[in-house]
Every structure is written in C-alpha cells, then in structure tokens.
C-alpha cells in the first residue's frame, strides 16, 4: 500500500469515495480500522452531482464523467484507495483510470 508521507515521516493512507452518497459513521470506522485509512476524501458537490445523474442509457459516459476524471487525476497519488460504485460504464472507466495511475480501486 502506498501512503502520503507527513513531515514527521508518518505514512497517511487516503481513500477517495466516488459514489452517490456518503459513508455512514460505521462504514467510515470500518474503513479506517480494516485498511488503516486516516483520510476519507469526498469529491466537491459539482463532481458528486455528475456521479449521481448519469443516465443508464448514456451513449458517451466517458465524456459525461470527464470532470470526475480530471478532479480525481489532480488529487490521486500512488496507492491511494478509491471506493467506486455506480453505473457500470462509469465504474469500469474509473477503475481502469485508477489502476493506470497506481491507485487501488475498491468496487
């Protein structure tokens, strides 16, 4: 697992959450305990809204989720976890991108 190093040399594990709702407190505790995650990161509302509104019959999902990909690429570092759930095409594209960038997708 890859971590972001703090000034004191402590490694921080991060997890991005990419789906239509927030984790419950119990789910957040479970993630922190089971994966050692210290930081859970949600996208800004404008990115979150895109993930919530993808039509099931969308012709070009890649174009629709472009802002999601741009946001994630600008924040993702090697070995960050990314929890992904949603429309199949969106999930596939995001999982592929996370793998290519050295992240760890959970889907």
Name every feature range the model reports, one short phrase each.
Residues 83-89:
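N-terminal glycine-rich "phosphate-gripper" loop used for MgATP/nucleotide binding
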Residues 89-95:
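An aromatic- and histidine-rich active-site surface loop
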